[in-house]
From Swiss-Prot:
CDD domains: Ribosomal_L18_L5e (cd00432). SUPFAM superfamilies: Translational machinery components (SSF53137). It is found in: Plastid, Chloroplast. One of its GO terms (molecular function) is 5S rRNA binding. The gene is rpl18. GO terms for cellular component: chloroplast; ribonucleoprotein complex; ribosome. This is Large ribosomal subunit protein uL18c. Gene3D superfamilies: 3.30.420.100.
Length: 109
């Protein structure tokens, strides 16, 4: 079995592998979020402001909308629990707004 660096990191830290991860990326113009199953290596659900809005949309309100849409899509596909992968970002501002909006919609993080 080929393991990527995210799987190896979770094994080393003793964290469960049965949950997909919610990966968040913020550019200057847009916010991107996707739920990834690292054991299979596939993106299960994705949402971003790039697909919904034109122009510069990287505010906290836009992050909340992305979190809501991502959670709705995930629950439709039967995904109820995820692990938050915020990368190098602090849990503050847009990252926090996206995560809390996803929690309000029923996704367990």
């Amino acid at each position: 079995m080929l393991m990527n660096r995210f799987v190896l990191k979770r094994v080393r830290q003793g964290k469960p592998l049965n949950k997909p991860r919610l990966s968040i990326f913020c550019s200057h113009k847009h916010i991107y979020a996707q739920i990834i199953d690292d054991m299979v290596g596939r993106t299960l659900v994705s949402a971003s402001t790039y697909h919904y809005k034109q122009g510069w949309h990287s505010t906290m309100k836009d992050a909340q909308e992305v979190g809501q849409k991502l959670a709705q899509q995930a629950l439709e596909k039967g995904i109820q629990q995820v692990v938050l992968d915020r990368g190098s970002y602090r849990y503050h501002g847009k990252i926090r707004a996206l995560a809390e909006a996803a929690r309000k919609e029923g996704l367990k993080i």
